[in-house]
């Protein structure tokens, strides 16, 4: 029978058994190596309230702590919530991570456009 993926959709490769984790969205049991894992860093306080808290704080320059959360999704929830996307047969063979999203002034910046702007700015300085 034909094989859809080289790794069979998991990262086990020779281990007999791996532990299970629960999906953060639907609580489905999914193998730890098959789960789509994401590490999120968020502020404990929403952005609208940060200034109010810093104004009311007794301590100057008080750093509000962040939430560090490791999220694990089952495959169906990850696809449904657009954490990962369905790729073509040729696209599935590409194992390189997708380009990092860059932000500038609160907006997403295309990496190719950002590199061109940096090169143009460097040429203007010389």
Swiss-Prot record:
Q: Give the region (Disordered) as residue ranges.
A: 88-107
What single Pfam family name could you report for this chain, choosing any that match?
A: Ribosomal_S26e
Q: Note the superkingdom of the native organism.
A: Eukaryota
Q: Name one GO biological process term.
A: translation
List the GO terms this entry assigns under cellular component, sorted alphabetically. Answer: cytosolic small ribosomal subunit
Which keywords belong to this entry? Ribonucleoprotein, Ribosomal protein
Q: Name one GO molecular function term.
A: mRNA binding
**What PROSITE patterns does this protein's entry cite?**
RIBOSOMAL_S26E (PS00733)
**Family stated for the protein in its record:** Belongs to the eukaryotic ribosomal protein eS26 family.
Any idea what this protein is called?
Answer: Small ribosomal subunit protein eS26
Q: Which gene encodes it?
A: RPS26
């Amino acid at each position: 029978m034909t094989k859809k993926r080289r790794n069979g959709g998991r990262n086990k490769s020779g281990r007999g058994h791996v532990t299970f984790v629960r999906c953060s969205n639907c609580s489905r049991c999914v193998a730890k190596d098959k789960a789509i894992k994401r590490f999120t860093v968020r502020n404990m306080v929403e952005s609208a309230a940060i200034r109010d808290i810093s104004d009311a704080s007794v301590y100057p320059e008080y750093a509000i702590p962040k939430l560090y959360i490791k999220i694990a999704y089952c495959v169906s929830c990850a696809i449904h919530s657009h954490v990962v996307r369905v790729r073509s047969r040729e696209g599935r063979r590409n194992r390189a991570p997708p380009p990092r999203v860059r932000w500038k002034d609160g907006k997403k910046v295309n990496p190719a456009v950002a590199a061109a702007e940096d090169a143009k700015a460097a040429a203007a300085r010389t």
